């Protein structure tokens, strides 16, 4: 097992009560691993208790990236939330802690 951060980096954005996280493979060869193991269901489970709505995954193969749009993730949004991280920027780092299976050695 390894952490997602070993093969990818991430960026976070927000709009209202919705957060989106892009997960970008460092190398194109790791994109199939992202596709297979970083599913909407796994992301939703990883953020249990944080994300109240659905998690939708968008695939960006030309960028070797995935984008997850998570509804109900920001406690009502920046203007309504009392959270220290109202924009949800720390969610990207938290997602990179997701455990995935090691890439097979060629």
Predicted regions: what is each one?
Residues 1-106:
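Long, contiguous binding/interaction regions
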């Amino acid at each position: 097992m390894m952490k997602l951060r070993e093969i990818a980096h991430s960026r976070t954005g927000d709009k209202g009560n919705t957060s989106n996280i892009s997960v970008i493979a460092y190398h194109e060869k790791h994109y199939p691993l992202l596709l297979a193991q970083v599913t909407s269901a796994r992301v939703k489970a990883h953020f249990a208790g944080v994300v109240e709505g659905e998690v939708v995954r968008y695939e960006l193969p030309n960028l070797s990236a995935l984008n997850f749009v998570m509804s109900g993730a920001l406690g009502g949004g920046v203007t309504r939330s009392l959270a220290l991280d109202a924009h949800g920027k720390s969610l990207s780092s938290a997602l990179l802690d997701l455990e995935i299976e090691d890439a097979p050695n060629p």
